[in-house]
Structure formats: C-alpha cells, structure tokens
Amino acid sequence: MTKQNDKNKKILQVATQLLKSEGDMGLTMRKVATSAGISLSNVQYYYTNKNALLQAIADQYFDDCVTQLKQQTPLESFEQLHMLITSQLNYAHEVSDMCRIFREYWAISTRNDDINEYLRRYYETVFTVICDVLRPLSSDDYTLKTSAALLVSFVEGYSVTGKFMPVESERIASTLLEAVRGSLTK
C-alpha cells in the first residue's frame, strides 16, 4: 500500500470514528486532521469538504452492504426467504457500529441534500437487489415491488428499534415472512 493510500485510509478511519462517537456536528475537517496527526491541508487534499468526506465514509459502509446483498442468489422457496429474513434481522442486531453510522446518515439527510440524494440512490439499489432475490417467488411485478418495499423498510426500521422490542427476533421473522408471503402470492 502506498503512503497516499495509507494516509487516505487513516483519514477515513478517524473520520468514521468521529462520526460514530460525536455525530455529524462533531465531525469537522480540523478534528479529523488533528486526530489523524496530519495537517488540515492534507485532509483537504483528499476531501475538499465535509460532504466529500461523508460520502467517502458512506461509500465504505454502503458498498459493503450492497456487495453482501448481491451475493444472495434468487430465492427458490419460502423456507429460503425465512432464512434470509432471519439473517437480516440478526445482522441488524449484531452490527451496532454500522447501524450507528446509518442512523447518523438518516439524520444528516434531513438537512443535507447531497447526503439525502446519496441515501436515495443507495436504497434504490438495495430495493432493486431485493426485487431480484424475490423475483422467483413473485406472481407479478406489482406484488414483487410491494414485497421488496415491505422487506427493505421493515429490516431498516428494525435495525433501529429491534433491540427495544419485547418479542424474540425469530417470532418477528416468522410474522414478517407471512406478511411478505401474503404480499408475494396475491
């Protein structure tokens, strides 16, 4: 790895940590530079402004999520759908740092058009991938899109609220399976 790549990686690591620990308002180019032990001009060489830095952090997390989803082969049975739902709900519980980053981006998107557009494109991609995964189980395009929207929306919301629910995730997964199955087979 080159010195430039090392420096860029360090900037992203420090910026990600600041975003997790201090949120959007605590993430400044100057704090990143100080925490990384490099000059502000070096940080600005790689990222001209905070939006560029936020997008680079998002690229790391969102690309990982999309890559993982794209590895999922199209489902051939509702048993496979149940396993997918269960794994997604469990994953939402296990990846607290990632969820913290997502929640921060959701908040930022309410006041930052660039990040809002970035999230729109990300969820559009996730929706398309989930449609591809569910397609073999669907009776038509309308039910496919409705089911994908239900699944994506629920899993994303569950990543925020799931740990506070007094119901086991397996029970939630079974209930969600029935809702998605009902939507897919209408």
Which residues make up each language-model segment?
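Basic, helix-initiating cap at the start of DNA-binding domains
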Residues: 1-22, 26-31, 35, 52
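Residues in soluble alpha-helical coiled-coils and helical-bundle/repeat scaffolds
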Residues: 2, 48-52, 93, 97, ...
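Amphipathic alpha-helical segments enriched in hydrophobic/aromatic and basic residues
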Residues: 19-22, 28-29, 39, 50-61, ...
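Hydrophobic alpha-helical connector segments
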Residues: 56, 70-97, 147-151, 170-174
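Amphipathic alpha-helical packing segments from all-alpha helical-bundle domains
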Residues: 94-103, 110-138, 149, 174
